[in-house]
């Protein structure tokens, strides 16, 4: 039973399937089909007076509905005010207010509803959006997708509201057998009964005057027997139905209706009062098409159920089932959905709760725009949920990893310096374990690993660590050993240099006491190697402005000529003025080779000796080893503590007493380089992290 009041919120000046109360002021009327619950007030005296006072009010319906309506004398006063619209034909209608002359243009399209002969749905399009009124309808799943006029440009039209037939919008009626299934069951029962004898008769107990024509026409066509009905006037202009119906009572299939049909049935008489010939009693069975009765069953039943000695129920419906309603609405996906019928045993609020999730209003009404992103790369994304259009596009592609290049000018971490001191200054090594641990973590965390051109020797000797450093450095070296994420240089490079016992007799090793896992930092050369240790050295050291940043940041290297390499001298200074000293004695045969040294190593061109002493920046755990063995002349590494040199300037390094001026033949290679136009320069480093 329809509960629709007749007016839509989008177009309140028209009335549909309701013709009383506020609807009397409508500018136009629409009738979906000829069932009494949709015709309230259609023949009321008040509406007749309205038509008499108006010249531009009309009733719009389908051609079949017009024929069915005008067959009744009660509705013949509408004859001059009914306009039929062909199905699936968009028609423009002008809604005129006769008092003010205001005019509104709308386009109306009639769509088949599948409810009964002539039943249609109304699709309204105008300034207030697109609205669909279904009336009573029965559409199977997927039929909405086959209606072209519900689509535009290959997609469903943007529908603002749907006024929906919700007669069976109840989970109890989740699935209703199709009309074809019901017809198959009824056809089998009727055939098995009427073929027994001419006195076996079937009565189709149908409540409504329209809607069961589908059964009548198909039974008559399959069995070759016409169906008896009370009147044929309504089908006079429908020959496809009229051919299968008759008013002759002498037939085996009846669909006649009588106000006291049940009484006639109790006395074994048909509503039409037909009796048998030759006083032979008739054998009559009744088949009542219904849907509500099946919805109240707690167990699944067949399409045809026997309810008495001669009575049957057939599950036949011309309203959409619960699943068909959801399929229809979810396909259209309107902004709003309003129920036209309150199902038996439920409330309007429950129906609205069912319809609301199927509408766009339950989601965001604003369209979601997403960039297409980078289409050159495909990416598989695993979803935890299956949520509509939020996962249509892939997430933005990740930024490619960048190489770890140090930027000392932008990042200045706090470094806990620890310098090696002489026996006269043991208090400088008395740092707390917390400071040492922080220094180790800082150095290992911010150390970047760059390519090194030098290969380490395959045979690495282990030397002892002084007892004065074991207590303070034990925790630091043990912590570094536990850090398995820091790679060792031995994994990437091999040692090719030979180590002499004389060169290591005065040098301690950090690998014996603590087993440090920190990377070994060193300067590289084509013919020699110089290894450095800061934590294990017993000297008092300091970093100059030019050499303070090299061992922390692992930055660029510069080429030194053979003259600079032979005259390199790095003197050890105190903590306030630290400068490493390099003393080399290289034969002239090797002076033609360039030495690749770290950028932060400061070479004194005025000093030259057989001993080489290199001390790196503080806070950088390294390994001390000997230089590569040279066949012509061995260069030994000896540790020399020179406390007097602590007063040297950052810009001028005085020559040591043992230094000699470079000989002329030593400078020959340098002059050749200058003659060819090749530039030889020692680049200066920027301010170190430790200088801050």
Swiss-Prot record:
Alphabetically ordered keywords of this record: Adaptive immunity, Disease variant, DNA damage, DNA recombination, DNA repair, Endonuclease, Exonuclease, Hydrolase, Immunity, Magnesium, Nuclease, Nucleus, Phosphoprotein, SCID
Polar residues composition-biased segments: 506-520, 544-555, 640-650
Ranges annotated as spanning the membrane: none
Modifications made to the protein after synthesis: Phosphorylation on undefined residues by PRKDC may stimulate endonucleolytic activity on 5' and 3' hairpins and overhangs. PRKDC must remain present, even after phosphorylation, for efficient hairpin opening. Also phosphorylated by ATM in response to ionizing radiation (IR) and by ATR in response to ultraviolet (UV) radiation.
Effect of residue 37 to N/A: Abolishes PRKDC-dependent endonuclease activity and V(D)J recombination
GO CC annotation: Golgi apparatus; nonhomologous end joining complex; nucleoplasm
Enzyme Commission number(s) from the entry: 3.1.-.-
Effect listed in the UniProt record for changing residue 33 to A: Abolishes PRKDC-dependent endonuclease activity and V(D)J recombination
CDD domains: artemis-SNM1C-like_MBL-fold
Quaternary state and interactors: Interacts with LIG4; the interaction is direct. Interacts with ATM. Interacts with BRCA1. Interacts with PRKDC. Interacts with TP53BP1. Also exhibits ATM- and phosphorylation-dependent interaction with the MRN complex, composed of MRE11, RAD50, and NBN.
Protein's UniProt name: Protein artemis
Name of encoding gene: DCLRE1C
């Amino acid at each position: 039973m329809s509960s629709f009041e007749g007016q839509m919120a989008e177009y309140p000046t028209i009335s549909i399937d309701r013709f009383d109360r506020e609807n009397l002021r409508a500018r136009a009327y629409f009738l979906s089909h000829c069932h009494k619950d949709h015709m309230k007030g259609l023949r009321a005296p008040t509406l007749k007076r309205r038509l008499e006072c108006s010249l531009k009010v009309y009733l719009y319906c389908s051609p079949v509905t017009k024929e069915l309506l005008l067959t009744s004398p009660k509705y013949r006063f509408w004859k001059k005010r009914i306009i039929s619209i062909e199905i699936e034909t968009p028609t423009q209608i002008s809604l005129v207010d006769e008092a003010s002359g205001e005019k509104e243009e709308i386009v109306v399209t009639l769509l088949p509803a599948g409810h009964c002969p002539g039943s249609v749905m109304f699709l309204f399009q105008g300034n207030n959006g697109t609205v669909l009124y279904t009336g009573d309808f029965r559409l199977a799943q997927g039929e909405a997708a086959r209606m072209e006029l519900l689509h535009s440009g290959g997609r469903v039209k943007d529908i603002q509201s749907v006024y929906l037939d919700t007669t069976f919008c109840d989970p109890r009626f989740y699935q209703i057998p199709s009309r074809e299934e019901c017809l198959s069951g009824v056809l089998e029962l009727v055939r098995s009964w009427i073929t027994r004898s001419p006195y076996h008769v079937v009565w189709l107990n149908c409540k409504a005057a329209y809607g069961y024509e589908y059964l009548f026409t198909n039974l008559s066509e399959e069995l070759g027997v016409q169906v008896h009905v009370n009147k044929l006037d309504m089908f006079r202009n429908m020959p496809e139905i009229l051919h299968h119906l008759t008013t002759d009572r002498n037939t085996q299939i009846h669909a006649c209706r009588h106000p006291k049909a049940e009484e006639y049935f109790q006395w074994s008489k048909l509503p039409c009062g037909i009796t048998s010939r030759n006083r032979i009693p008739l054998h009559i069975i009744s088949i009542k098409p219904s849907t509500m009765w099946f919805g109240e069953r707690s167990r699944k039943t067949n399409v045809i159920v026997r309810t008495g000695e001669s009575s049957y129920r057939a599950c036949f419906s011309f309203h959409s089932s619960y699943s068909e309603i959801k399929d229809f609405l979810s396909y259209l996906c309107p902004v709003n959905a309003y129920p036209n019928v309150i199902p038996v045993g439920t409330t309007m609020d429950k129906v609205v709760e069912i319809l609301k999730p199927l509408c766009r209003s339950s989601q965001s009404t604003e369209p979601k725009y997403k960039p297409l992103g980078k289409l050159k790369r495909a990416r598989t994304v695993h979803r935890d949920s299956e949520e509509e259009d939020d996962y249509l596009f892939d997430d933005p592609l990740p930024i490619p990893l960048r190489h770890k290049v140090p930027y000392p000018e932008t990042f200045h971490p706090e470094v806990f310096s620890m310098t090696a001191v002489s026996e006269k200054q043991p208090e400088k090594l008395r740092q707390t374990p917390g400071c040492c641990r922080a220094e180790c973590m800082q150095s290992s965390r911010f150390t970047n690993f760059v390519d090194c051109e030098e290969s380490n020797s395959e045979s690495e000797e282990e030397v002892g660590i002084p007892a004065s450093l074991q207590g303070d450095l034990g925790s630091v070296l043990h912590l570094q050993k536990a850090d398995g994420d820091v790679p060792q240089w031995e994994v990437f490079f091999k040692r090719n240099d030979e180590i002499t016992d004389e060169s290591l007799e005065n040098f301690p090793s950090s690998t014996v006491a603590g087993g440090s896992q920190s990377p070994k930092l060193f300067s590289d050369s084509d013919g020699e190697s110089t290894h450095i240790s800061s934590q294990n050295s017993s000297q008092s050291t300091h970093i100059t402005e030019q050499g303070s940043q090299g061992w922390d940041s692992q930055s660029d290297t510069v080429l030194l000529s053979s003259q600079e390499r032979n005259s390199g001298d790095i003197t050890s200074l105190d903590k306030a003025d630290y400068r490493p000293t390099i003393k080399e004695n290289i034969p002239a045969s090797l002076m033609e080779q360039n030495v690749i040294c770290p950028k932060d190593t400061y070479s004194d061109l005025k000093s030259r000796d057989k001993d080489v002493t290199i001390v790196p920046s503080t806070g950088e755990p390294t390994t001390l080893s000997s230089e590569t063995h040279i066949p012509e002349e061995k260069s030994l590494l000896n540790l020399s503590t020179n406390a007097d040199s602590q007063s040297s300037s950052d810009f001028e390094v005085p020559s040591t007493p043992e230094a000699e001026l470079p000989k002329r033949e030593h400078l020959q290679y340098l002059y050749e380089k200058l003659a060819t136009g090749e530039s030889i320069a020692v680049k200066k480093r920027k301010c170190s992290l430790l200088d801050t």
